[in-house]
């Protein structure tokens, strides 16, 4: 689900890791939302309610909700696969709040993992961190957002488990009917986290500082959905240089 009121939102981490001045420039813009974002939030909330306790859902609430049903089905299939593999204990957390303040350095910063599955076997423990995307733009699971959630989940459960592997997954029903995963280790996530901490420190230092403009890095990826690209001086300069 979307991250609310964060200066360094996990959902935009792939962009501010490249363009350090982006959060400072975007903070000057009034907050807004789109119809698509509101619809995505509604679908996330409905799916979470079903996964938490399907008996609390009225039958008509799932009418005309094929994407939500597909996501719920994918999570249930994943749980069943673990059962068939001989799991001893299986824990499911939905819409799990994760503390990311120790990673990004932003006080009180949180992210919300749509689904976390902890699978305890006799001699090892695996964890799935799954993010549901209800848009049309294909999303690769090898993103900073899902890695950030993965690291935050490892830190949350580290006193209980030493994970053999962490599976970071995306489910996007408008693109594919299957979960898409990458496999990482805790050590890989710790290395990633160190890079995030360093980059986040720079972005935070630019908050409210006019020198943030000197840290704007235009590019196709980070500018595509940037809400201030219409007034980004670095992008304007880059475009002018290409003419």
Residue positions per predicted region:
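Short, histidine-centered active-site or binding-site loop motifs used for metal coordination
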Residues: 28-29, 131-134, 172-174
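Short coil/turn segments at secondary-structure boundaries
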Residues: 26-29, 59-62, 88-96, 213-223
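Metal-dependent nuclease catalytic regions and adjoining charged, substrate-binding loops involved
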Residues: 2-3, 7, 72-79, 103-105, ...
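Charged, glycine-rich intrinsically disordered N-terminal tails and low-complexity linkers that flank
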Residues: 1-57
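Generic detection of long, well-ordered alpha-helical segments
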Residues: 33-41, 62-72, 143, 186-193
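Catalytic cores of nuclease domains that cleave nucleic-acid phosphodiester backbones
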Residues: 46-146, 155-168
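Active-site-adjacent bridging/hinge elements
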Residues: 15-21, 115-129, 197-201
């Amino acid at each position: 689900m979307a991250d609310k009121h964060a200066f360094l939102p996990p959902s935009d981490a792939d962009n501010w890791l490249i363009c350090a001045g982006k959060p400072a420039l975007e903070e000057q813009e009034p907050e807004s939302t789109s119809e698509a974002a509101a619809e995505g939030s509604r679908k996330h909330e409905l799916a979470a309610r079903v996964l938490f306790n399907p008996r609390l859902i009225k039958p008509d609430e799932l009418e005309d909700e094929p994407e939500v049903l597909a996501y719920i089905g994918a999570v249930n299939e994943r749980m069943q696969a673990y059962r068939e593999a001989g799991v001893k204990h299986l824990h499911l957390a939905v819409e799990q709040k994760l503390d990311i303040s120790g990673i990004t350095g932003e006080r009180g910063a949180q992210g919300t993992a749509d689904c976390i599955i902890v699978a305890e076997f006799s001699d090892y423990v695996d964890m799935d961190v799954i993010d549901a995307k209800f848009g049309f733009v294909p999303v690769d699971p090898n993103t900073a957002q899902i890695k950030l959630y993965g690291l935050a989940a490892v830190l949350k459960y580290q006193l209980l488990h030493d994970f053999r592997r962490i599976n970071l997954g995306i489910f996007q029903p408008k693109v594919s009917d299957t979960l898409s995963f990458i496999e990482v280790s805790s050590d890989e996530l710790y290395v990633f986290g160190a890079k995030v901490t360093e980059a986040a420190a720079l972005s935070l230092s630019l908050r409210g500082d006019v020198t943030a403009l000197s840290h704007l890095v235009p590019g196709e990826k980070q500018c595509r959905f940037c809400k201030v690209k219409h007034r980004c001086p670095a992008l304007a300069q880059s475009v002018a240089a290409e003419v």
